[in-house]
């Protein structure tokens, strides 16, 4: 039986009582530079039919309403002047005051039953579908631990490359790119350890193996494969537009269908925007985690790339709490953000055959990526644009999301896959 690190186990055991925020530090969501930054910070309690031991802690897949989060948060009322000026000047122009005890308050957040992506019914529909196709999902992120027992069977393989012979067998300019490429170090070393937790976590949400004792991915390894494209690295998960552009081109050249982008920048290049606009892939993008105080803002007014790009091949995702509200840190936008998906206290894979909770729009985007891959695999007669339409046309409407997202709702995988059959 796989075992979680001791600290994670103790967190799991306390889930039905009180949740405390993940100890992992939040990375800045938007930087005043051209570099990309990751969108994460930082746990459902009913076992899924997949038969995975830790699936009972995946509230995003089956929310029974038994969770509570207790935390200290910023008291918005004490910061009203920030919001009054924000729309005019942008966050970089605001002189923020020092924060003291009076700026914070303790609050409880209780889960609401059925605020989840409705995956069980979707799996049933998927299992009844014949003639599925294999879908390749490119994850442009930090690296991914391809040896993780919950991921190893879901990793894409370049069949034209002979592993370890030091020769560029397929002549594509990348030597021994068996599972993807590291565009940070220009090598085939696609996992270097702890710094690749972010990408590994997203990979587990999308396609962790079913019925093997770990967690359950939205899809499984039979018909969905993950292409590992490391374009961000270092302790803060930074990367250049040039690296991401090269990764996009690699993904296209090697047959990727869907691309997950859980990062962003407030100052991207025209070349980067064109790379997405001109691609045939469907991009699922994280909306971003707000300002330096982790308070989300309107990206219709203060755009973030690629989340604010108005292209037909982009789906932008906000971070939904287990009570049906956007997380305070999640960016929003009645035009730019298409829908919300669970992104707070998401349990998934990390390097070293381990598991951890993370929170942020980086965790929400892979939920939609996994859903898109599942539906696209099931419906061989539909285009990727059809899949986007299905997902956005069938959201679970939630009053708190009205005016915050274009659809006013959250991801409903079952409704989306059934919609495609009508």
How would you label these PLM feature ranges?
Residues 27-136, 144-150, 421:
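Protease zymogen maturation seam
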């Amino acid at each position: 039986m796989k075992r979680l690190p001791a600290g994670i186990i103790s967190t799991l055991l306390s889930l039905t009582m009180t949740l405390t925020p993940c100890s992992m530090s939040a990375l800045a969501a938007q930087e005043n530079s051209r570099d990309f930054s990751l969108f994460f910070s930082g746990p459902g309690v009913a076992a899924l039919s997949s038969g995975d031991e830790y699936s009972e802690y995946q509230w995003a897949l089956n929310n029974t309403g038994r969770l509570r989060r207790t935390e200290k948060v910023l008291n918005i009322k004490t910061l009203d002047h920030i919001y009054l000026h924000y729309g005019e000047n942008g966050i970089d122009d605001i002189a923020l005051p020092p924060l003291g005890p009076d700026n914070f308050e303790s609050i409880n957040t209780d889960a609401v039953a059925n605020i989840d992506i409705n995956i069980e019914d979707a799996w049933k529909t998927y299992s009844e579908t014949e003639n599925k196709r294999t879908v390749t999902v490119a994850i442009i992120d930090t690296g991914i631990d391809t040896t993780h027992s919950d991921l190893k069977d879901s990793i894409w393989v370049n069949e034209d490359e002979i592993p370890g012979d030091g020769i560029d067998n397929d002549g594509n300019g990348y030597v021994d790119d068996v599972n993807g490429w590291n565009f940070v170090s220009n090598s085939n070393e696609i996992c270097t350890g702890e710094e690749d937790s972010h990408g590994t976590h997203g990979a587990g949400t999308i396609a962790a193996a079913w019925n093997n004792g770990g967690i359950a991915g939205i899809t499984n390894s039979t018909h969905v494969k993950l292409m590992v494209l490391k374009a961000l690295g270092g302790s803060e998960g930074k990367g250049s537009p040039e690296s991401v552009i090269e990764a996009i081109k690699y993904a296209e050249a090697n047959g990727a269908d869907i691309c997950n982008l859980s990062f962003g920048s407030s100052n991207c290049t025209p070349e980067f925007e064109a790379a997405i606009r001109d691609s045939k892939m469907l991009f699922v993008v994280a909306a971003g985690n707000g300002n330096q105080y982790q308070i989300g803002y309107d990206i219709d007014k203060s755009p973030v790339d690629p989340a604010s790009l108005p292209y037909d091949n982009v789906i932008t995702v906000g971070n939904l709490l287990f009570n049906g509200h956007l997380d305070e840190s999640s960016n929003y936008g009645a035009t730019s953000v298409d829908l919300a998906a669970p992104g707070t206290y998401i349990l998934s894979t990390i390097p070293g055959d381990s598991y951890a909770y993370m929170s942020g729009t980086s965790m929400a985007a892979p939920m939609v990526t996994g859903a898109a891959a599942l539906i696209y695999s099931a419906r061989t007669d539909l285009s990727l644009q059809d899949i986007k339409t299905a997902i956005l046309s069938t959201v679970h409407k939630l009053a708190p999301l009205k005016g915050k997202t274009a659809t006013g709702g959250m991801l409903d995988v079952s409704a989306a896959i059934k919609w495609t059959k009508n």
